[in-house]
């Protein structure tokens, strides 16, 4: 009998704690100071508003997303509803990534590269959350 399943079982709580606490802290930060997120979301929100009438402000959308990430991050960190929490976090990261790391719009090569790295990092985070949801 291999020890791999046992080792995975022992690592799962630590992985959830590390992953979830990151989202909890960052989401809470957005709730406390939504301004930078509102600025980052402006272009994406403007594009959405061209297609759909939204009865909420950009700041409300950013705050709700921050609250969602904080709450689901905390749940994941505590091991409560981990699959659902991971799935919701992955879903919330898609618009966050598209709003915050629009590397394809950057003209400065250095800024473009930095945003591309952050975009790819977020994609990896989404992949990790999906993996956590399946595990």
Where are the regions a protein language model picked out?
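Short amphipathic, positively biased membrane-proximal segments
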Residues: 1-135
